[in-house]
Amino acid sequence: MMYCLPVVCILLLLIPSSATFVVESRLEKDQAQSFTGDAWKRVSPIHEMIQRSQCCAVKKNCCHVG
């Protein structure tokens, strides 16, 4: 079994929101929307990981995939 550190969980939760903020602040809105859409398709495995880390933060048994 693998266990995440709480810090890793927190970082995983913070990355998407900060990345989106940077994209929106640097690009115009329509460009930001299309970019975020394309990027989101590429990072969907990361999104799964984030959901797992949220679960890990709640259940305290990090990254164990049954």
From Swiss-Prot:
Post-translational modification: Contains 2 disulfide bonds that can be either 'C1-C3, C2-C4' or 'C1-C4, C2-C3', since these disulfide connectivities have been observed for conotoxins with cysteine framework V (for examples, see AC P0DQQ7 and AC P81755).
Subcellular location: Secreted
Free-text tissue specificity from the UniProt record: Expressed by the venom duct.
Pfam families, A to Z: Chi-conotoxin
Family membership: Belongs to the conotoxin T superfamily.
Role this protein plays: Probable neurotoxin with unknown target. Possibly targets ion channels.
Protein name listed in UniProt: Conotoxin Cal5.2
The organism of origin for this protein: Californiconus californicus
Lineage: Eukaryota, Metazoa, Spiralia, Lophotrochozoa, Mollusca
